[in-house]
UniProtKB/Swiss-Prot annotation:
Stretches assigned to the Lumenal side: 118-140, 318-329, 802-811, 876-927, 981-995
Any one biological process term the GO annotation gives: potassium ion import across plasma membrane
Family membership noted in the UniProt record: Belongs to the cation transport ATPase (P-type) (TC 3.A.3) family. Type IIC subfamily.
Classification lineage: Eukaryota, Metazoa, Chordata, Craniata, Vertebrata
Record's protein name: Potassium-transporting ATPase alpha chain 2
Record carries keyword 4Fe-4S: no
E.C. numbers: 7.2.2.19
Intervals, Cytoplasmic compartment: 1-96, 162-297, 348-781, 833-852, 948-961, 1017-1033
Gene Ontology terms: cellular component: plasma membrane
Gene label: ATP12A
Phosphoserine, modified sites: 952
């Protein structure tokens, strides 16, 4: 019996067998650190030995050393409190804020910029140590690079700091006080002081202060939705009803809410040992994987660093072989590496992601982690919770059965379009029972509030019936006044019916009306007649069969079905002054008239089916993962399109072919409904097989730990997994997923804080918007990086020519800085506003290992095609400036040594003019300015061609993205300021530049545009060709 308890309990609480086998597989590949982390997570998922729900009161007293009547003694309670600690959740070890801040300072691009800054300072140190009259340019450049990292890091840290800690949100759920019996006295004590063995009392509206084994109960119902995902209130009693502690009715769980009734129970678990405590530990113990965009940025950093170091070392060797001093060669090496660092890209990517996050916030997607913006676009699997995410999170009347027909009710948010026949006399009787046999009431003062938005005092089912009646019949409270209630038996789990007796509003009819609703089979047992078309008829075999057929059909749709009946009590037996006694039941409860059935369901949101269809066309697999019943889960999955209309499960095929499930070929089924019980017995390989072979999957009756295992299974398939949810039970999976998406309205604080994104309108359809934005930002980041990398070659070539050919330096490091952080920042960001080129929601999600942010096609095209063309254009401007001042290009070759000697003040140009060191320096700065302007003019063309990767810019529209033109204007203004307004400030290394030099590079800019248009034309003409594979980035 013991083993059975543990085995069945594990269905809902964990998947230890799965994780153990998974750990054994992964252990072969993991290092010791990974194994240590795996064992820690294993510890969180281990099984609990709990059989308190099976014990009698006497056995419980003996086990916990308490007394049901007197409670614990204060002395014993103090001892237990000292032994077990307070009834509170232990916060996990916090990462110090300084560590969080430092992580922002050295991650991704940041490390590249830090290396660049340090190399700049080293270069200056080498120059200073060797007594060279080196400028402070390298010092300034190092400082600016450091500032870029620090400012961007502060911004990113601020974004992260806005997220609150998960554990604090769990703590908010904990009740503050509890009513406890100690020393035979009732006391109100802080909930933190509860210990195992305490006898506590709860009532409607209270939060359960610990895991409690109920001893006495009176009409107690609890809301377990935050733990199990079940929409319906769960009745609680002292009876042992199920082997599984999560299913039995005699245990109430820490932090769930008592909706109505009263109960007394014994505390059996406190703090971290409670179910909620284990979920809290599991959620905070799950580590976040790297986001796809973080991986891409790391990959990009490796590419840039690899290119920079390779070129630097190559030219270091060349410089040494050309007899340069080793110290000078080291400085050249550093200069080449720094020239390859895209200084502005860190800020550009951060700002671009922030802008997209703001855009998504306007569409009800609040992004907490900036990198999650792109992750949503990479998503290939969405594991969605059912209750409150796919559904409206409110019970709604879905179908009615009367007059031997099933009618469909309007389950939309308004319920205003009820199209079923309301002319029948049977409906008149049924609607009256629905309105009267109901304890729910609207809170006063809501007359001007729409019916569906009014606050109701009552459970979910009663609320659904009240609102349904109010929409169809009008003022229900007025109907109740006219039909005064004189007696009532509330619903309880033993009787399974609710009964009330009323005076009738007909002054000519002195009879009392008894109305009853409850479990259909129980209601039918009490009836001898049935109402058909307003007339009572004997309840014969045919009518009973019609009832059973309808009941099975409605139940098969996953709906909660209620039966309704009534009886007019004879006036001579029950006169006007008759005293009804509900304890002795001095009135008949048999030979009633059956009137009809009504079924309820938590209906899907109206926008969800379309959203699921869009996910399907976008190549995204939507998996439902819920704690609800498999029949209900499957019904909702079919209604929203997660399971297609023509898809069948193995069970469906078996039923259709009238054969055993084992005889069905599993490959014939497209859909699968997997329960927690089945999942518990699966190995990781079997789970992987299901995830790989079935395109349409529903997981039902799953525990929080199993949701986590499902997410891990999807990630083993190399899927980028998004998880949606709103309950505490979803938080571990939200944390583990590549992107966690919580509901903003109905979501618990725990779910919101575990998530990377919050849907402010709780609408699954908003995810589709987020996916589109995520895919668009990936495309646009590609364009931004391509635009940024292009000028790197134009900035690098001057150093190479300076070393090999010995020309005067064409451009300085400060000038490069003004390009990267001055003229190019706004245009780079402007590309984030570019619209889609094609319907990006009709393509498959990108493969995270094949579809890279920076691939070799992008690098080659940016560096070797456009980059070299841009370098040639900039050199043309440089040579033009020197030629017009008297230095022909041939005269500049190997002139560098003489050019830089301070004591040479009579250097002759091609015309025999003599140049002093100051005049040469001024001309050199003019060359810097000209080279800068040459790059800037060509970058305008580069910016325009980057608007698209395949389409012509005329197809895309030159003026659709007006921010691009703001960027171009900013480029020109910054260049004008530097070459005109600030040209006299020598520290900036700029000079006043003649107007004609601005137009020298224009032909090259036009050539860049024409060249790229030809590339795109061939891409469109020959899709899938060699050209397409090698020239499309």
């Amino acid at each position: 019996m013991r083993r059975k308890t543990l085995e069945i309990y594990s269905v809902e609480l964990d998947g230890t067998k799965d994780t153990k086998q998974l750990g054994q597989e992964e252990g072969k590949k993991c290092n010791e650190l990974d194994l240590k982390k795996s064992s820690q997570k294993e510890e969180l998922k281990k099984e609990l030995d709990l059989d308190d729900h099976k014990l009698t009161s006497e056995e419980l007293e003996q086990k916990y050393g308490t007394n049901i009547i007197r409670g614990l003694s204060s002395t014993r309670a103090a001892e237990l409190l000292a032994r077990d600690g307070p009834n509170a959740l232990s916060p996990p070890k916090q990462t110090p804020e300084i560590i969080k801040f430092l992580k922002q300072m050295i991650g991704g691009f940041s490390i590249l910029l830090w290396v660049g800054a340090i190399l700049c300072w080293i270069a200056y140190g080498i120059q200073y140590a060797s007594n060279q009259s080196g400028s402070l340019d390298n010092v300034y450049l190092g400082v600016v690079l450091a500032l870029v990292v620090i400012l961007t890091g502060i911004f990113a840290y601020y974004q992260e700091a806005k997220s609150t800690n998960i554990m604090s949100s769990f703590s908010k759920m904990i009740p503050q006080e509890a009513l406890v019996t100690r020393d035979a006295e009732k006391k109100v004590i802080p909930a933190e002081q509860l210990v195992v063995g305490d006898i506590v009392e709860i009532k409607g509206g209270d939060q359960i202060p610990a895991d409690i084994r109920l001893l006495f109960s009176q009409g107690c119902k609890v809301d377990n939705s935050s733990l199990t995902g079940e929409s319906e209130p769960q009745p609680r009693s002292a009876e042992f009803t199920h082997e599984n502690p999560l299913e039995t009715k005699n245990i109430a769980f820490y932090s769930t809410t008592c909706l109505e009734g009263t109960a007394t129970g014994m505390v059996i678990n406190t703090g971290d040992r409670t179910i909620i405590g284990r979920i809290a530990s599991l959620a905070s113990g799950v580590g976040n994987e790297k986001t796809p965009i973080a991986t891409e940025i790391e990959h990009f950093v490796h590419i840039v660093a690899g290119v920079a170091v390779s070129i630097g070392i190559l030219f270091f060797i060349i410089a040494v072989s050309l007899k340069y001093r080793v110290l000078d060669s080291i400085i050249f090496l550093i200069g080449i590496i720094v020239a390859n660092v895209p200084e502005g890209l860190l800020a550009t990517v951060t700002v671009t992601l922030s802008l997209t996050a703001k855009r998504m916030a306007k569409k009800n997607c609040l992004v907490k982690n900036l990198e999650a913006v792109e992750t949503l676009g990479s998503t290939s699997v969405i594991c969605s919770d059912k209750t409150g995410t796919l559904t409206q999170n409110r019970m709604t009347v879905a179908h009615l059965w009367f007059d031997s027909q099933i009618f469909t009710a309007d389950t939309s948010e308004s319920q205003s379009n009820q199209a079923f026949d309301q002319s029948s006399g049977t409906w008149a009787s049924l609607s009256k029972i629905i309105a009267l046999c109901n304890r729910a009431e609207f809170r006063p003062g809501q007359e001007n509030v729409p019916i569906m938005k009014r606050v109701v005092v009552g459970d979910a089912s009663e609320t659904a019936l009240l609102k349904f009646s109010e929409v169809i019949l009008g003022d229900v409270m007025e109907i109740r006044k006219r039909n005064r209630k004189v007696a009532e038996i509330p619903f309880n789990s033993t009787n399974k019916f609710q009964l009330s007796i009323h005076e009738t509003e007909d002054p000519g009819d002195p009879r009392f009306l008894m109305v009853m609703k409850g479990a259909p089979e129980r209601i039918l047992e009490k009836c001898s007649t049935i109402m058909i078309n307003g007339q009572e008829q004997p309840l014969d075999k045919n009518n009973a069969n019609a009832f059973h057929t309808a009941y099975m059909e409605l139940g098969g749709m996953g709906e909660r079905v209620l039966g309704f009946c009534h009886l007019y009590l004879p006036a001579h037996e029950f006169p006007e002054n008759y005293s009804f006694d509900v304890d002795t039941m001095n009135f008949p409860t048999s030979n009633l008239c059956f009137v009809g059935l009504l079924s309820m369901i938590d209906p899907p949101r109206s926008t969800v089916p379309d959203a699921v269809a869009k996910c399907r066309s976008a190549g995204i697999k939507v998996i439902m993962v819920t704690g609800d019943h498999p029949i209900t889960a499957k019904a909702i999955a079919k209604s929203v399109g997660i399971i297609s209309a023509n898809s069948e499960t193995v069970e469906d095929i078996a039923k259709r072919c009238n054969i055993a499930v084992e005889q069905v070929n599993k490959q014939d089924a497209r859909a699968a409904v997997v329960t927690g019980m089945e999942l518990k017995d699966m190995t990781p390989e079997q789970l992987d097989e299901i995830l790989a072979n079935y395109p349409e999957i529903v997981f039902a009756r799953t525990s929080p730990q199993q949701k986590l295992i499902i997410v891990e299974g999807c990630q083993r398939q190399n899927a980028v997994v998004a998880v949606t949810g709103d309950g505490v039970n979803d938080s571990p999976a939200l944390k583990k997923a590549d992107i966690g998406i919580a509901m903003g309205i109905a979501g618990s604080d725990a779910a919101k804080n575990a998530a990377d994104m919050v849907l402010l309108d709780d609408n699954f359809a908003s995810i589709v918007t987020g996916v589109e934005e995520g895919r668009l930002i990936f495309d646009n980041l590609k364009k931004t990086i391509a635009y940024t990398l292009t000028k790197n070659i134009a900035e690098l070539c001057p150093f190479l020519v300076y070393i090999i050919v010995g020309l005067p330096l064409p451009i300085g490091t400060i000038t490069i800085l003004f390009i990267d952080l001055g003229t190019d920042i706004i245009p780079s960001i402007a590309l984030a506003y570019e619209k889609v080129e094609s319907d990006i929601m009709n393509r498959k999600p990108r493969h995270k290992k094949k579809d890279r942010l920076v691939n070799h096609q992008l690098a080659i095209y940016s560096y070797l095609h456009i980059g070299l063309m841009q370098a040639l254009g900039a050199f043309l401007v440089y040579f033009t400036v020197y030629a017009q001042q008297g230095f022909w290009p041939t005269s500049l070759i190997q002139l560098r040594v003489k050019w830089e000697q301070d004591y040479v003040n009579d250097l002759e140009d091609s015309y025999g003019q003599q140049w002093t060191r100051y005049q040469r320096k001024y001309l050199e700065w003019t060359g810097y300015t000209a080279f800068f302007v040459g790059i800037m003019v060509q970058q305008i063309a580069d910016l325009i061609i980057r608007k698209t990767r395949r389409n012509s810019i005329f197809q895309q529209g030159l003026f659709r993205n007006k921010v691009i033109w703001v960027g171009i204007t900013s480029q020109i203004i910054v260049a004008l300021i530097l070459s005109c307004g600030l040209g006299s400030i020598t520290a900036l290394n700029f000079t006043m530049l003649r107007v004609q030099y601005w137009f020298v590079a224009v032909p090259h800019a036009i050539l860049i545009w024409v060249y790229d248009e030809v590339r795109k034309l061939f891409l469109r003409l020959y899709p899938g060709s060699w050209w397409d594979k090698n020239m499309y980035y």
